[in-house]
């Protein structure tokens, strides 16, 4: 046992006490460098080789890659180091102070998902790493909660090809082998303002948007009829019209109207295909009102993800846990890390706690998670 390292709870406390919020708003966004440096020190103390990787086009964000052992294959344990911002008015405790009450560990990132690294490091202190005959990798990424820039950059730049990767997102220790993607778009209509007493002298953007929404709802129905995957509780792609704003006064012809929509494609649907379907749906509007319709990404799109049920990784994890791998509707970094090697999502904590005030992880997960991590390392690195 490595006695130089802090205790499990002390590791957890230090992680939660180190803010690493990612946000599109620059006023809220924070570098994760302090957290990455903290992890680097602990992993180095365990004897792993550590590399800090600056992530391009971010606000001073870093990935960390640590490894023990050389050669082909092996296991990668992955997680993100950032959290969402917090609503101070809805939290009843300090989000950056780990507190324990009623068998729960409270704090921002306890479940989603900085706490994972406390589990990994605490498990590694009891592993005889010199007995591993395949490499073990620990990947800590940046900006999962916004652009997924860390995972995108790692997948695009690494030459590593482990046998498999486990992303420790909070899944209540149930294996996840597939999830939908995410496309978030802004539809903007530019009209021509004027006095409401003479409608013919203007172009009402709200009226054009009304017609555009009709075409979007037709597309939504088409997606439901054309695509189907029974692995999902909601087995078709979804579209949500989530936000709309237009105009500034009742007596003024609306000059601009903007709609924000969310689409969740199934695995196997390419983002290019989905964009093409969206553009085709709005082609009649664009043709009738030349130059007045624009479509923009609100966030970088995320493709769907699936690790086939017959994949050796899925078979091994299902046998290890005695549970079938499932499909979910939320997104993770899996589609990007799947480009590197077969990937599953499996970790402690409940997804119901993600992005919630007074976020917590039940202490019931502590022993099973340590056991699972030990089993994973022995299975994939000592074969």
Swiss-Prot record:
The keyword Metal-binding applies. It catalyses: N(2)-acetyl-L-ornithine + H2O = L-ornithine + acetate. It holds the Pfam family M20_dimer. Its EC number is 3.5.1.16. Catalyzes the hydrolysis of the amide bond of N(2)-acetylated L-amino acids. Cleaves the acetyl group from N-acetyl-L-ornithine to form L-ornithine, an intermediate in L-arginine biosynthesis pathway, and a branchpoint in the synthesis of polyamines. Homodimer. This is Acetylornithine deacetylase. The lineage of its organism: Bacteria, Pseudomonadati, Pseudomonadota, Gammaproteobacteria, Enterobacterales. The gene is argE.
